[in-house]
Amino acid sequence: MSHLFDPRLPALAASPMLYLYGPERPGLPLAFAPAAALAASGRAETPQKPPYSYIALIAMAIQDAPEQRVTLNGIYQFIMDRFPFYHDNRQGWQNSIRHNLSLNDCFVKVPREKGRPGKGSYWTLDPRCLDMFENGNYRRRKRKPKPGPGAPEAKRPRAETHQRSAEAQPEAGSGAGGSGPAISRLQAAPAGPSPLLDGPSPPAPLHWPGTASPNEDAGDAAQGAAAVAVGQAARTGDGPGSPLRPASRSSPKSSDKSKSFSIDSILAGKQGQKPPSGDELLGGAKPGPGGRLGASLLAASSSLRPPFNASLMLDPHVQGGFYQLGIPFLSYFPLQVPDTVLHFQ
């Protein structure tokens, strides 16, 4: 413990020093060293940079002036007198002082009056910026830029023109003779195969030619004639400019009639009927007066019984297409048509 209180211990060569800066007094060192030690340490160490921005330094110089205005050289002299750090490298920080004076709105340049001695204009503080300095420091505020008078008006015409162009597009589509919506419907329709030309007719149970009674044949023929007449009247009433309608709408009764047969009725009819004659085997349809369109497509000899009968009806309104192809096709007899119907262009 004796070496801690030994008087021969060397004294501290340089004690830590703290400088307090202010606008009214120079740096005041706080230390408990002799004056000689303070002088030696001050020469050896460079002075500390004051914790103030250039804007705060300029504001201090302006407020310290008697008329609250000072020239550029007066600002330089005030800074060098109060803060020893700025004695060196004058060119660097003086450029920064000029830069802040010209770009900051808080500093206002006042021209010198005529006849007043000296040269250079004065710099003063804007009265609206006095509250931006707290304890000598400049408090930056983020000012929201005020929109110009023409900014909102410039945006409104753009929105209005965009809305008008959007409204003009449906009007242009509807004004073209009504063809726009029709074209859009045709384009939006699925490109599926036609039920008349491409797709086969709905399947129906097989019906042997010999099982049909004369009463059933007469009723089926009447229903088929009415269906064909209604279909032709609907197609001719539309006119040449109307779109083609599917002809399958005119034969719902015949399809329902053909679907009404079941396997039990076929088996019961086969047990109660006798084998048909040769005339029924060849045609499957009774010959009528004047000759009729719709001869049997499949012929068989007298010794063989055809498994089914097929009839073909041509549609005069659809070129190259068939009205209906059914296997079997015994729901109605083929109708007698004039020769002009079979004349295709």
Curated annotation (Swiss-Prot):
Principal location class: nucleus
UniProt cross-references to InterPro entries, sorted A to Z: FH_FOXL1 (IPR047514), Fork_head_dom (IPR001766), FOX_domain-containing (IPR050211), TF_fork_head_CS_1 (IPR018122), TF_fork_head_CS_2 (IPR030456), WH-like_DNA-bd_sf (IPR036388), WH_DNA-bd_sf (IPR036390)
GO molecular function: DNA binding; DNA binding, bending; DNA-binding transcription factor activity; DNA-binding transcription factor activity, RNA polymerase II-specific; RNA polymerase II cis-regulatory region sequence-specific DNA binding; sequence-specific DNA binding
Comp. bias regions, Basic and acidic residues: 153-165
Keywords: Deafness, Disease variant, DNA-binding, Nucleus, Transcription, Transcription regulation
One term under GO cellular component: chromatin
Record's disease association: Otosclerosis 11: A form of otosclerosis, a pathological condition of the ear characterized by formation of spongy bone in the labyrinth capsule, especially in front of and posterior to the footplate of the stapes, resulting in conductive hearing impairment. Cochlear otosclerosis may also develop, resulting in sensorineural hearing loss. OTSC11 is an autosomal dominant form characterized by onset of progressive deafness in the second to third decade of life. Deafness ranges from moderate to severe, and may be conductive, sensorineural, or mixed.
Composition skew (Low complexity), residue ranges: 188-199, 220-234, 242-253
Subcellular location: Nucleus
Region (Disordered): 136-289
Protein name: Forkhead box protein L1
Entry superkingdom: Eukaryota
